Amino acid sequence: MMDINKIKEVLPHRYPFLLIDRIIDLEPDFSAHAIKCVTINEPFFEGHFPGRPLMPGVLVVEAIVQTACFAVGIKMKEEMKNPGVSFMTIDKCKFRKPVTPGDVLNLK
């Protein structure tokens, strides 16, 4: 298990755009399992939507991408290579249910 401090060593993102809280499983260069505890204090809930807060889908995708970039970036960092990893495109993305305050995202 890796906490937020380890995540910040690998990813360049910071509040409010660091969207993963913890890595709970990792196979470097292959996969990672992260979690994001979604709270009512997330800055995007103020405007999305008042009275019915929903996490924007693009931020759910961003959290998944950060998880994948961590899986690749940690090995690059350990090997002292440039840890910069970018995600360029996504096709056929579907959201099965809304993400609301109190939810825990399991990102794989």
Model-derived segments and spans:
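Short Pro/Gly-enriched beta-strand edge/turn motifs at strand-loop
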Residues: 2-7
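Active-site- and interface-proximal helix/loop "cap" or "latch" segments in soluble metabolic
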Residues: 55-56, 60-74
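Beta-strand-rich interaction surfaces with strong enrichment in secreted/lumenal proteins
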Residues: 8, 51, 95-97
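Hydrophobic beta-strand-centered segment that forms part of the acyl-chain substrate-binding groove
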Residues: 1, 68-108
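Catalytic strand-loop segment that frames the active site of acyl-thioester-processing enzymes
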Residues: 15-55, 60
